[in-house]
Amino acid sequence: FGYIKPDVQANKANSPFVIASGKQAALAPYFSQFLLNADQWDGYNGERKALMQHLRSNNIKNVVALTGDIHSFFAGTVNDDFDSVGGGTPTMVDLVTAGMSSDSFFSYLRDAVGSLSTDLATLVYYPISIPTGTPLGTLNITFNLLDYTMGQTAPTLDLLADQARVQVRGALAQAGAPEAQLDVLTEQMLAGLKASPSFNTNLLGLAQQLSGLNSNPWLKYARTDAQGFAVVTLTPGNLSCQFKQVNRLVGNNA
């Protein structure tokens, strides 16, 4: 493996090992680089380095950025030099809130990834069909895997089901479930999901594998498919931030 890995990294889809696998065409998209969003720190690498260097050089500590407008919840650190080995030294804290009514960052990427490559879709979402056993029919949702691809902590089965809660509830509402029954029906659907091998084995295993890539170790929390807001409490000795997720909009109602 010590010989195979460097060759694949250097030659990518043209590596003889990739060619010999018979999967060259299928694997080719995974060697491509895509610019997902330049309107964030990644699009201002020079400015970020300069600002972080200013903070470190002047021994300015306890700096926290409170931002939003990326349609997701994120929490992590901003390092002084992401180009260095290990990604640099943490210099400040970044807390990012989702929006109340905007579509999520995940939804934009989910809609775009199919036109790029269906093979890449597994890095972003996993389609799930949930039979309700009622006149509501079958619910079809696209489960968010982007969080784990970006580095969210590996889930347990309970956490995975809880992540699907808002999406399942929204799908039930769109299917015409009475509002008074939404919470009960959501619990029933989630219980069925947890008992399904496609969820408790296939999806859970895939999410854990993607998380294991450790793509962004400085990112401590990611929820890219959410609407909500943040509540920040600041005292002389402490700052805390609570991310509050709300139910998905149905029509004009949350």
Label every model-predicted segment.
Residues 1-254:
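Long, structured stretches of catalytic cores involved in phosphate-ester chemistry, encompassing
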